[in-house]
């Protein structure tokens, strides 16, 4: 398990360390990515301390890693237990923004 309170940079380094090998070993036909926002520092149930920027960078990293390796990705939103609905909606929008950027970056 990840340590409680893990912040953006450490989380993203951990993701970069494991995701490419995981994909290479499994070679999925399709990646189903649940872009939960409960790792956010403001989430009342989550145990990590990611910022909005960290969530966006995570989504970019996951999507870019998958697409660059040739794996199709389907994204869903999930998790997120903030009391401020506007903040929660914004956090859920980040994966859509990341997907749009990756789409244009890779000319899909």
Say what each PLM segment does.
Residues 1-108:
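A general "terminal functional-core" signal
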């Amino acid at each position: 398990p990840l340590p409680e309170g893990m912040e953006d940079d450490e989380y993203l380094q951990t993701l970069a360390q494991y995701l490419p090998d995981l994909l290479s070993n499994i070679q999925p036909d399709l990646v189903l990515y649940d872009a939960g926002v409960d790792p956010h520092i403001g989430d009342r149930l989550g145990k990590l301390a990611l910022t909005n920027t960290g969530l966006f960078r995570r989504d970019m990293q996951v999507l870019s890693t998958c697409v660059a390796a040739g794996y199709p990705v389907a994204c869903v939103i999930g998790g997120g237990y903030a009391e401020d609905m506007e903040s929660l909606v914004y956090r859920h929008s980040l994966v859509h923004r990341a997907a749009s950027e990756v789409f244009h970056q890779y000319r899909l």
